[in-house]
Each structure stands twice: as C-alpha cells, then as structure tokens.
Design a protein with these regions (language model features):
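Ubiquitin-like/PB1-type beta-grasp interaction modules and other compact soluble beta-rich domains
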Residues: 1-66
Length: 67
C-alpha cells in the first residue's frame, strides 16, 4: 500500500493505522502537541485507529515552543 506522509511517498505491507504511523515518526503512539490530517481532514486522537488506505495523503504536525 502506498501513501504520502508530509509530502513524501511511503509504502507499507498490509494495513497500518494512523497511530502506528505517528508512533513510527515520533516514538510515541499518543504524543501531546501532535495533530494529524488525512486527505485534508483532521483526525482526532480518539480516531487514530483509522486504517490508512492506498493513496491517502497524511500530514503530521508537531507543535513546538519558541520565541
């Protein structure tokens, strides 16, 4: 299955959930300060069990503090 993550092509054998992708990217399955959008729709953390499908475009946004 092929999908896009933050503008870069990715592939996975079999199904993968949003939570699994977030964990792979951040090291934590439910990190604070992280927002996820799939195909332009924000996915609440309570729905991160959503299975990414072939062709999905996913964005992970991480809040950072700065000044």
């Amino acid at each position: 299955m092929d999908y896009t993550l933050n503008g870069k092509s990715r592939s996975s054998e079999g199904y993968i959930t949003v939570a699994a992708v977030v964990k792979a990217e951040t090291g934590d399955a439910s990190p604070k300060g992280v927002a996820v959008a799939v195909n332009g729709d924000v996915i609440p953390a309570s729905d991160w069990s959503y299975e990414v499908t072939d062709g999905d475009e996913m964005d992970i946004l991480i809040a950072v503090q700065g000044g």
